[in-house]
Amino acid sequence: MDFGTVVRRRIKQAPPDRGGWNIFFTLIDRSIPNTNPYGNQAIRADGKAGWDGWPASPRIEALRAAWLDAADPDEQRRICVELQQQLWQDTPFIPMGEYWQATAYRRDLTDVSSGCFATFFGVRRV
């Protein structure tokens, strides 16, 4: 199936026997800021308004909001520990693997961007 069809079909909230989905694969690009509870799309649990699969957990969402409101790094760490425990309870996603794309660049190229998509703007030859 082509990716355009996946994108159209994965938003259907019907059961699989009526054209909906209950699982799909995707990737999260390293360049997307998913290193904190705010930027990580995969741990969102805001129900039907959220990402495909529509996980719903008011507690996860409350902890994400509390992390944003935390006054200092120690409080953020405490909230992250609690959030991680809640994520094991509600499990909004399951990572099924990881890959790294082996890439080589010529020595005379600089300013090559990182990420999973090839972009050539800004690259310079020295």
Question: Across the structure, where does each feature detected by a protein language model lie?
Answer:
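Phenylalanine-focused residue identity feature
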Residues: 3, 24-25, 54, 93, ...
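Short flexible/disordered coil segments
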Residues: 25-40, 61-71, 89-92
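Bilobed periplasmic-binding protein-like "clamshell/Venus-flytrap" ligand-binding domains
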Residues: 17-24, 70-107
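Short, solvent-exposed loop/beta-turn-alpha elements that line the ligand-binding surface or hinge
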Residues: 11-19, 38-69, 98-126
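Short linear motifs at secondary-structure transitions and domain/linker junctions
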Residues: 2, 70-74, 119
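Solvent-exposed, polar/charged alpha-helical surfaces in well-ordered, non-transmembrane soluble domains
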Residues: 8, 58-65, 74-85
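Periplasmic binding protein-like
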Residues: 1-42, 80
